[in-house]
Amino acid sequence: MSVDVLVEPFYEWVVDASGIKGARPEISGVTYVDDPMPYIERKLLTVNTGHSAIAYLGYARGLDTIHAALEDPAVRDGASEALEETGLLLAREHGFDPEELREYRQRVLARFENPRISDEVTRVARAPIRKLGRDERFVSPALRLMEMGREPRHLAAVIRAVLGFDHPQDAEAVELQETIRAEGERRALARYAGIEEDHPLVGLVLESSEPARG
């Protein structure tokens, strides 16, 4: 019996070379690095941040799948601009070439555009409280950019969309909305992001316009 398996053309294989003794084997598609941490963070702040940003912005626009969300110019532009901000951070902190980062972002977005491997936005956006965490994909780069003197307006706009995620079948979304109703967005965001209510990021998020439904 044969089984057809659908796979993605996108993959990334970065290998920590510090533990390899002798010559490094030549394997197509493998990148050997002495310190894998910058590449891990590049993946987290591009693939994870981008995927989730598309989901939250798409949900706010009333769209069902990642593929459909990326066909909406408002979602695509919002996610792309947020990734430009994380790209700036990656270039500054880890020394990545800006042009290489741009090409990497394009490959990642092309992966998400694949209609044959498209996720439901509600699945990708699940667990919004965790994703609002201080060390997570949106708040962490936003705080670090602010420490650099940058204003992460596009990441802030995505965080505003996270606050609006109210899918009734997601336990964290239900808790988030209950907290917002009881305490307001400012206190809820500060609590879940682990920052003070008067932190400039809180103000920047709340100044962002709520995404208009498509």
Predicted segment positions?
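Substrate/ligand-engaging "lid" and interaction regions
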Residues: M1-G214
